[in-house]
UniProtKB/Swiss-Prot annotation:
Protein name, entry field: Putative F-box protein At5g50220
Organism: Arabidopsis thaliana
Family annotation (InterPro entries): F-box-assoc_dom_typ3 (IPR013187), F-box-assoc_interact_dom (IPR017451), F-box-like_dom_sf (IPR036047), F-box_dom (IPR001810)
Pfam family, one: FBA_3
Domain F-box: from-to ranges: 27-73
Length: 357
C-alpha cells in the first residue's frame, strides 16, 4: 500500500513552477497580437470593462488611462450615444459627506466635490473611473471660504480648476489638471468685490456665472478658460434683479427663473453684441422646490428634487416649454428602508472618460 501510494503521489505531483512560466511566455509569443489591433479591440469594450482591464498589464493601463488618442475615442463614442443623467444622493446626516460644487462644462466627464461643510477642501472626481484627486492648497491657504469652477480648454485639451477667494484677499488661482508642476498659479482678478454664485456653466471654453456684491444687484461675469481672463457680460436689467439659473440651452447661454413662473432668456451667439431674447414665459407656481439640472438638446428642462427622504421614490421631470408639457421618469434602486434626508446632486449629460487623474 505504501508503495502504491507513493506511485500515485508521483503521478499527481504538480509540475515545476519554472515550466509553467516558460509555457506562459510561449503562449503569448504564439498569439502575437499587434499593438494596433489590440488597441482597436479595447476601443470596442464598455467603459466599465476597460476600467477593470487596467490591471491586466502596465501597457494596458497606460493605453486606457493615459493615451490621448484612446481616451478621445472613448469620449467620441460616448457622445454619439443617447445622453444619460447620473444622479448622486448624499445623506445630510453625515457631516463629512461629499457635495458637488461645480458642474460647469458641457462635456460631463469630471466634477469638483467638496470634502467638508465649509467648502475649503476640494477634489476632482471622475464618475467613469470612480477616481478622485485631492486638490492642493492654494498659496492663500484654507483659512477662508473659496469658490471653485471647473472649465475645459478645447484647443489645448486641458481641464482647469479656477479658485476664487470670496473675502478679503480678492485673488484668483488656476490649477491645470495633468500639469507636472501640480501647483496653483495666481492670475489677475478685477472683480474681487463680487461674491460668485453656483452653479456656473461652461460653453465653448468660457465659464459664465452670476455674482453679487453685498447690498447691490446681481452681475453676470465670465472667465475665458483659454486666455485665463475675466470679463463682465451685459444683460437686461430685469434679469439682474434676482438670481437666475444658468444653463446651456442648445449651445447658447441661457438664463432660467423658476419661482412663481417659468422664464427663459437666451443670449445670441454674437461676439460683438451681447443681445438677449426671451424665448419663453409662463406663470406657474411650485417650481421653487425643484433643482434645475440641465436643458436637453431638444430644449426640455430637466428637474429633480432638491431634498428627498430615502424611503421615497426618486423621479426626474422633463418640462417642455414650447408645448408646456411635463413627463416623469422613475429612477429605480434609490429607496432605502432607513429613513433619513438626502441631498440630490444631478450630473447631467455624463460622458464616459477613462482618463487617469
Amino acid at each position: 500500500m505504501k508503495r502504491g501510494s507513493e506511485e500515485i503521489k508521483e503521478e499527481t505531483s504538480p509540475l515545476p513552477a519554472k515550466h509553467f512560466q516558460r509555457r506562459e511566455v510561449s503562449i503569448a509569443e504564439d498569439i502575437g497580437i499587434p499593438i494596433d489591433l489590440m488597441v482597436e479591440i479595447l476601443k470596442k469594450l464598455p467603459a466599465k470593462s476597460l476600467i477593470k482591464f487596467q490591471c491586466v498589464s502596465k501597457q494596458w493601463s497606460s493605453i486606457i488611462g493615459s493615451s490621448r488618442d484612446f481616451i478621445d475615442s472613448i469620449v467620441t463614442r460616448s457622445l454619439s450615444q443617447p445622453s444619460r443623467d447620473i444622479l448622486i444622493s448624499f445623506s445630510t446626516t453625515l457631516t463629512n459627506s461629499l457635495k458637488q460644487i461645480s458642474s460647469s462644462f458641457p462635456l460631463r466627464t469630471l466634477d469638483i466635490l467638496t470634502k467638508n461643510q465649509s467648502y475649503t477642501e476640494a477634489a476632482i472626481y471622475n464618475p467613469t473611473t470612480r477616481q478622485s484627486l485631492s486638490l492642493p492648497e492654494t498659496t492663500a491657504g484654507h483659512s477662508h471660504v473659496s469658490t471653485s469652477f471647473l472649465g475645459y480648454d478645447p484647443f489645448k485639451n486641458q481641464y482647469k480648476v479656477i479658485c476664487l477667494d470670496n473675502y478679503k484677499r480678492r485673488c484668483c488661482h488656476v490649477f491645470t489638471l495633468g500639469d507636472a508642476i501640480r501647483k496653483w498659479r495666481k492670475i489677475q482678478y478685477n472683480f474681487g468685490l463680487y461674491f460668485p454664485l453656483l452653479p456656473p456653466v461652461c460653453i465653448k471654453g468660457t465659464i459664465y456665472y452670476q455674482a453679487k456684491q453685498y447690498g447691490s444687484t446681481y452681475v453676470l461675469l465670465c472667465f475665458d478658460v483659454i486666455s485665463e481672463k475675466f470679463d463682465q457680460v451685459e444683460a437686461p436689467k430685469t434679469m439682474m434683479d434676482h438670481r437666475y439659473t444658468l444653463i446651456n440651452y442648445q449651445g447658447k447661454l441661457g438664463f432660467m427663473c423658476c419661482q412663481n413662473r417659468v422664464e427663459i432668456w437666451v443670449m445670441k451667439n454674437d461676439e460683438k453684441k451681447q443681445e438677449w431674447s426671451k424665448i419663453f414665459f409662463y406663470e406657474m407656481a411650485g417650481f421653487e422646490k425643484w433643482h434645475i439640472a440641465r436643458a436637453t438638446p431638444s430644449g426640455e428642462i430637466v428637474f429633480v428634487n432638491r431634498l428627498l427622504l430615502s424611503c421615497q421614490t426618486l423621479y426626474v421631470y422633463y418640462y417642455g416649454p414650447k408645448r408646456n408639457s411635463m413627463r416623469r421618469v422613475e429612477v429605480e434602486g434609490t429607496k432605502y428602508r432607513r429613513k433619513h434626508l438626502v441631498h440630490i446632486c444631478p450630473v447631467p449629460d455624463h460622458v464616459e472618460n477613462t482618463m487617469r487623474l
